[in-house]
Regions:
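Catalytic domains of carbohydrate-active enzymes, especially glycoside hydrolases
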Residues: 1
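Catalytic core of soluble alpha/beta enzymes
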Residues: 4-137, 145
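Flexible C-terminal active-site loop/helix
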Residues: 137-202
Length: 202
């Protein structure tokens, strides 16, 4: 799977062209996910979502404001493609309300935003009780462990780090990210590499 950021075209046809161009570049064996970064209103999300669904996407993320729970629920009802959201939610209560509203088909959780490992696991359990898969938002070094630890873990968002701050890199094998077996998160911080990015207050 690869994820494509959308949300800047005035008409659905423009976004569809982007998706088809990427699909042609990566080949038919690679599934396309899209992230609209909350760029659309509810009406646009339905129109763009239908067009993108026809283009073969397998994931529609952040189509509209995460606060528009009724709009997200409506979108989930009218589209077959899974509606993913949640990276902008902080803590357990907003996820509870989102789940109760039927606003997501896939819950995206950010370990740093929800409050750490324990709240993350509690939210994953809430999602599991409703049959909702969960995904991690960035921080793959931690999320690979969390998603392996819950029965409804769906996928890890992974991109190679442009800044090498760890002594060892995560292993990607046949499209799967392998959880390190060393203690803790299984990665060691490279103190010398981090020193280049240290910021000191005057």
């Amino acid at each position: 799977m690869v994820k494509l950021r959308l949300g800047h075209e005035a008409k659905p046809e423009g976004e569809v062209q982007r998706v088809r161009a990427v699909q042609e570049a990566v080949g038919p064996q690679v599934q396309i996910m899209v992230d609209a970064t909350e760029s659309w209103n509810e009406g646009q999300a339905v129109a763009f979502g239908r067009a993108l669904q026809e283009a073969g996407i397998v994931w529609l993320e952040d189509s509209m404001s995460h606060q528009n729970l009724s709009g997200l629920a409506h979108l989930s009802d009218v589209l077959d493609v899974p509606i993913a959201a949640g990276e902008h939610l902080f803590g357990l209560d907003p996820f509870q309300k989102t789940f109760d509203a039927g606003a997501v088909d896939i819950a995206i959780m950010d370990l740093a935003r929800v409050g750490g490992i324990t709240p993350w696991m509690k939210i994953a359990a809430l999602a599991e009780a409703r049959g909702i898969p969960v995904a991690g938002h960035v921080i793959p070094e931690a999320h690979v462990h969390l998603l392996a630890a819950v029965p409804n873990g769906h996928l890890v968002e992974y991109m190679p780090r442009s800044v090498p701050i760890f002594d060892s890199a995560l292993t990607l094998e046949d499209g799967h990210l392998l959880a390190p077996q060393a203690p803790g998160l299984g990665v060691e911080l490279n103190e010398a590499a981090c020193e280049k990015y240290r910021v000191q207050q005057p």
